């Protein structure tokens, strides 16, 4: 069977209407009459945002062409490189000191970054020998802590020390099931080495025994990873919302998936990573979901954060992950996990166990 993209791509409205259909690459399917035509996939113009200047969907297609061969050990090398990209700088752990709240470690702060916090000695307190950072003991209520730290982050944000303020609060807690001690601006979380949580949904379609993944291309207006490839649905877990509630919310906002359909998503585990980049220490746990979608499903972005979508054979997605840097880094981990669970990465491949282990390099607590 010839493989190709079943796609939704942006086309300027001056050239095509929002419902214009033009033929593109061919593939065969014996799917029901509700699915796309049997011998041709189509491009549907649904956006007007231009593609990223760094790469186009044509570049993605060119790098996906060669069929993925699980027995080829070089394939796992490419996957291992993507895992390593999410787990950089761990030899620099000694440059960080604990951030402690109520005698529990909630994060880690780089010694170099503490110079900015020392200017706010009515909010941040340092131990006698600088071994850890905590908050002023007078700040003993979550709301008071949230307001006080928000004041500091606003000042540091205005100075460009903490860029990309999102006005989205994340909980500060030592582990997932622990109560939150307070909340903090999402953009500041890596500067305090806080644990972060997110949901990632592998939205897939199955035809004639072959699986296809819906892939999104991030808007160029995104403050992080603009223009990169992403999951159909993915999003951080903010304060005051459960994982399931966030799943439903993100499904609707990012892909126009109804609650009825989102409720079919199956929780399949987690991946985790720890990454150090100068003053930032990212410690994230990603809740992974598989969602089998109807063959005639077409995603529609609702929040302006996605530029375009493509439906791509999983074997070709594997090649893009292995051979390129087109995907947002953390997405590669979730896709590699999907490849394990759906049999595209097999025990016969050298490095199989090492790759599997390293998908959970972070603290899954």
UniProtKB/Swiss-Prot annotation:
Its EC number is 3.6.1.-. GO terms for cellular component: chloroplast. Residues 1-30 form a transit peptide. It is an enzyme of class 3 (hydrolase). Its main location: plastid. SUPFAM superfamilies: Nudix (SSF55811). Expressed in leaves. It comes from the Eukaryota. Keywords: Chloroplast, Hydrolase, Magnesium, Manganese, Metal-binding, Plastid, Transit peptide. GO terms for molecular function: hydrolase activity; metal ion binding. InterPro entries: DUF4743, NUDIX_hydrolase-like_dom_sf, NUDIX_hydrolase_dom. Residues 196-337 form the Nudix hydrolase domain. It is found in: Plastid, Chloroplast. Mg(2+) binds at residues 250, 254. A motif (Nudix box) lies at residues 235-256. Coiled coil: none annotated. Its cofactor is Mg(2+); Mn(2+). PROSITE patterns: NUDIX. Belongs to the Nudix hydrolase family. Probably mediates the hydrolysis of some nucleoside diphosphate derivatives. This is Nudix hydrolase 24, chloroplastic. It comes from Arabidopsis thaliana (Mouse-ear cress). The lineage of its organism: Eukaryota, Viridiplantae, Streptophyta, Embryophyta, Tracheophyta. The gene is NUDT24.
């Amino acid at each position: 069977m010839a493989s190709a993209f079943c796609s939704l791509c942006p086309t300027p409205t001056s050239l095509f209407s929002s419902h214009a259909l033009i033929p593109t690459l061919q593939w065969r399917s014996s799917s029901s009459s509700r699915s796309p035509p049997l011998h041709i996939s189509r491009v549907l113009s649904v956006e007007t945002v231009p593609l990223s200047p760094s790469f186009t969907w044509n570049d993605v297609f060119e790098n996906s062409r060669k069929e993925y061969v699980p027995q080829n050990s070089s394939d796992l090398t490419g996957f291992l490189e993507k895992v390593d990209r999410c787990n950089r700088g761990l030899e620099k752990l000694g440059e960080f000191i604990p951030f402690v709240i109520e005698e529990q470690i909630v994060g880690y702060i780089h010694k170099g970054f503490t110079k900015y916090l020392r200017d706010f000695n009515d909010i941040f307190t340092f131990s006698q020998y600088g071994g850890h950072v905590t908050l002023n003991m007078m700040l003993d209520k979550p709301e008071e802590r949230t307001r006080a730290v928000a004041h500091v982050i606003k000042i540091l944000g205005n100075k460009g020390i903490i860029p990309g303020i999102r006005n989205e609060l994340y909980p500060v807690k030592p582990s997932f099931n622990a109560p939150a001690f307070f909340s903090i601006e999402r953009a500041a979380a890596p500067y305090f080495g806080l644990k972060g949580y997110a949901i990632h949904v592998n939205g897939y379609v199955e035809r004639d025994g072959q699986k296809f993944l819906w892939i999104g291309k991030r808007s160029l207006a995104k403050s992080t990873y603009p223009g990169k490839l992403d999951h159909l649905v993915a999003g951080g877990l903010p304060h005051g919302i459960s994982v399931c509630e966030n799943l439903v919310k993100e499904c609707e906002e990012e892909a126009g998936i109804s609650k009825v359909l989102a409720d079919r998503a199956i929780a399949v585990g987690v991946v985790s990573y720890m990454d150090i980049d100068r003053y930032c220490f990212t410690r994230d746990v990603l809740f992974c979901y598989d969602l089998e979608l109807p063959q005639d499903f077409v995603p529609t972005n609702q929040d302006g954060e996605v530029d375009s979508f493509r439906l791509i054979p999983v074997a070709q997605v594997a090649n893009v992950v292995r051979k390129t840097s087109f995907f947002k880094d953390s997405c590669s981990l979730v896709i590699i996990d999907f490849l394990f669970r759906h049999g595209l990465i097999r025990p016969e491949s050298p490095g199989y166990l090492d790759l599997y282990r390293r998908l959970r390099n972070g603290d899954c607590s």
